[in-house]
């Protein structure tokens, strides 16, 4: 059911056993403990996929010309660090789990207990150490990546990114093209909440989501034409094989589908990196 207003009416009439809720309906129910449906909410079953932001380093405009403003911005390490260290996604997580939003936080490609190195160390623990979040656990209150961040540290990182990018001709706010399927109220609500997360985290003078829609195929209408600033995609195949997934992201051979059609980093290498792409 793509029209959740109609779906909610069907649920109220006992014509449906379960239903995903629109953002407005969910907020209405959760904000009132006496609501008739407040005690009927339950967490959805987790999927087997690891969902991640996938940046596009070779974004094009609709006319096929390079989106230089975004491409220069996303190539900057301080700019990307703002996503990792300053973007509060709890309201967005709540779109998928209103009861325990932070259960949706995903810091790794691979789950714990899946693979170990020759010394018996869990692969996830090795990654956590590299990320500086070793030992951090779910607490139901804060995102792991934001625990070491302060308002001052994020303001300084934002200023660094803006100063470095202004010097190479980037104008602000940087628009990040983000697409959702047309006619789907859930997808529209998700995108709207995500856009607000950027506003709440950084203000409107730095990064803004530029929302767009596609009709039926994200791949054919958005990814292959390279129109996205980033996409959120789930990795499910070979979930226990981190080498395969990392290879998909960073290698440039013909089989590295992600680097050719998601990040387009292989295109950058093929064309020859510009001076401002040296960090990549």
Which ranges hold each PLM region?
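Extracellular/periplasmic solute-recognition and catalytic clefts
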Residues: 1-63, 94
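Extracytoplasmic/secreted cell-surface and envelope-processing proteins
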Residues: 7-9, 27-31, 53, 62-66, ...
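Periplasmic binding protein-like
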Residues: 11, 16, 21, 35, ...
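Structural recognition of the beta-strand scaffold that forms the well-ordered cores
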Residues: 17-21, 51-56, 82-86, 93-94, ...
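Extracellular/periplasmic catalytic domains that process cell-envelope and extracellular macromolecules
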Residues: 46-48, 76, 169-172, 222-226
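Short helix-loop capping/hinge motifs at secondary-structure junctions, enriched
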Residues: 59-79
